[in-house]
Structure formats: structure tokens, C-alpha cells
């Protein structure tokens, strides 16, 4: 929420810790300060991962602005950064520009910080989705996500998820974390082949 205060974020993190949530996503300006003594395991025990965004929600920021925003978030202590691609480049089939943008951002978000790339799949053809996923794999993105949920065209479709899963499978990058057969069964119930 744009009106969120530091107190709101602190309360969100406390609630996430209490509920055992793995992560909370906050605006870059609201990334909480790291504990004064990070070696104090009591201070960090059960604390959720801090995720944030860059180029959100439109993806229309200049590449260097996105990379700078992402790098600043890393320096503030973000554990994960979700970045929105410039979907116009994907629609136009400008794979080189897309790869260049993603490489610049990956350099700004060094591992072990997690880089998640958000596509707006509701706007993309099958080939554009496949090209975006291949670009994400090529630059070492850790995750590829279907949509921001903010675009008027809509969010994820099962077809888009299947296309992305197929492309990730080809690159041997499709994994199910922590759920194994249950995940496959659940996705199967939704009609997704994983």
C-alpha cells in the first residue's frame, strides 16, 4: 500500500513471523533495517525473507533505473527482488534488448539475492512467452512469474503457466520445491502439466 508506514511494515513482519510466513514483500523504501547484531540468532529466528520490487508495476522504467532501484534494495538488505520486464520489448520480439535489460539487472542483483522476473503473460503470444522465459534462463534469473496482477489485461492463465513450465522443463529449470508429488497432483487438478 502506498500509504504504509514503517510501523505498518513492522507489524506486517511481526505477523508474518507469528504465522510462519516465509517472506514479505515491501516497497523498496520500506525495507526494514537489518538487526543491529545479525549474529544474534534470537533476533533473526523465524524472521521472514524480505522481498521487494523494481520497475513495478509497469516495467516501463529505463533499464538503468530498474537496475539502480534493484541494487539499492539489495544494499538496504532485500533478500529477493521481483523485477517487471518491459513487456513492449517482448511483444515486439526484441529478444536482444530483453536479454540486455535482464543481464544489467542480474548484475545489479548478485547471488545469493534471489532475482524473480515478472512477465505480463496476458499480453504476450506463446512465442513471446517462450522467448522471455529463455531470456530469463540465459541471464540466470532464479524465478519467472506470470504477472503483476495489476495490468488491466488480467493475470495468469493456465495456458501461460503451461507454456512457461514447458520452456523451463526444456532448460531443466522446472523444479517443485518442498511439495514433490503433491505439487504435481495439485497442478494436475488445475489442468497444468508439470
Which residues make up each language-model segment?
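Metallocofactor- and cofactor-centric catalytic cores in central/energy metabolism, strongly enriched
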Residues: 22
